A protein has these predicted regions:
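Residues forming the flavin
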Residues: 1-254
Length: 254
């Protein structure tokens, strides 16, 4: 009931990704515990609405921090990959918060800042030099509550000393994970997964959309962490491969 059978000659799997759940593996971030601990996605919604506030009281924050690599580059939870876009998005959102709230101090706690392409110049340095966003290399180990603020605790790895920073708003830069749709398509079409749980591409670096199943191609974050440009490029390549496969099949039939 509600199902429809469709006969097709080729398939492009473009099932995207899902965001890491920062409360799924550990409560060190206090995501389900403290209202003022949110994610990049939550922040993007507020920025689009033109109203960045603390969820706990509806007031504009005076101190905000981003915590990078939440659910990425983490062997303890098994996510041993860089999600590729989090650093750039955090810098973009940091700039937008400073534009919206000029008196708000913004911090970014990071392991390494990984900026791809022109983001290094257009976003990263712009955030530091023009908008005075504070970048602190360190490891966050715990988020607690003190009064009406959340307190970020960890280590400043550059200075080699303990870190404790009271914040009004903590933003978690959550990484990418294989989506449920990717897992379902893998089972449905018997597509092998690579070691991280994404659909395996067998075409090498010059042909990243080919899978182990003839006529089935993969695009975007279904094959691994990807930004918008990667996804669009792979989508176009997969569509061309699918069209070529269909044409080849029709020529054989003729």
């Amino acid at each position: 009931k509600g199902e429809e059978k469709v006969d097709v000659g080729s398939i492009v799997v473009a099932t995207g990704f899902q965001h890491f759940d920062p409360g799924k593996e550990t409560q060190m971030y206090g995501y389900y515990e403290f209202d003022d601990v949110i994610t990049l996605v939550d922040t993007e919604r507020m920025l689009k609405a033109g109203n960045v506030v603390r969820p706990s009281n509806g007031e504009a924050p005076k101190q905000v921090c981003f915590i990078q690599c939440v659910g990425s580059r983490d062997r303890q939870i098994g996510n041993q990959w860089c999600s590729k876009v989090c650093c750039g998005i955090a810098c973009k959102e940091a700039i937008e918060i400073r534009q919206m709230l000029p008196e708000c101090r913004v911090f970014v706690f990071y392991i390494d800042m990984r900026m791809y392409g022109f983001w290094e110049d257009e976003i990263y340095w712009k955030a530091q030099e023009e908008y005075k966003v504070n970048f602190i290399r360190g490891i966050v180990t715990e988020i607690t509550k003190r009064g009406d603020q959340v307190v970020v605790k960890g280590e400043d790895t550059t200075m080699g000393r303990p870190l404790e920073a009271p914040m009004d708003l903590v933003i978690l830069s959550v990484g990418m994970e294989p989506s449920e749709g990717t897992t379902q398509m893998s089972k449905l079409f018997q597509l092998p997964l690579e070691s991280h749980g994404y659909i395996e591409s067998i075409g090498g670096a010059l042909n990243t959309v080919v899978t182990a199943v003839p006529g089935v191609f993969v695009a975007g974050a279904a094959a691994g962490p990807a930004d918008l440009e990667d996804s669009v490029s792979m989508g176009g390549a997969a569509a061309m491969k699918a069209a070529a496969y269909l044409r080849k099949a029709s020529l054989k039939a003729a």
